[in-house]
């Protein structure tokens, strides 16, 4: 079982200052170990609803974790 979740983070950038943004993490469920982080992509968007919609689409389409970076890249290129 794989799940995709949005997480909030605060980043400080030398030119932009401090800002809130959202990333997406991919976790796999392992019996006896629970949910284990597979990978995460940071600073995808500053729009929580957009991040949640993208994570929901990944979940709905049962995206394999190895495709997470490609999907995020496609999303960012389509903005």
Which positions does each model-derived feature cover?
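Short N-terminal "domain-start" leader segments
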Residues: 1-24
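Short loop/turn segments immediately following beta-strands, especially the blade-tip
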Residues: 28-31
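Generic alpha-helical secondary structure signal
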Residues: 8-11, 26, 53, 79
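Intrinsically disordered, low-complexity acidic regions enriched in Pro/Ser/Thr
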Residues: 16, 36, 76-79
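Low-complexity, intrinsically disordered short peptide segments enriched in small/polar/basic residues
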Residues: 3, 38-41, 69
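A short, exposed loop/beta-hairpin motif centered on an aromatic-Gly-Thr core
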Residues: 35-49, 57-59
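Short, solvent-exposed secondary-structure capping/transition elements
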Residues: 33-36, 67
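Compositionally biased, intrinsically disordered linkers/stalks adjacent to structured regions
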Residues: 49-79
């Amino acid at each position: 079982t794989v799940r995709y979740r949005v997480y909030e983070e605060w980043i400080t950038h030398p030119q932009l200052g401090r800002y809130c943004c959202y990333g997406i993490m991919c976790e796999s469920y392992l019996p006896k170990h629970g949910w284990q982080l597979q990978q995460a992509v940071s600073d995808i968007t500053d729009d929580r609803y957009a991040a949640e919609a993208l994570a929901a689409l990944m979940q709905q389409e049962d995206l394999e974790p190895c495709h997470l970076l490609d999907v995020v890249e496609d999303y960012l290129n389509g903005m």
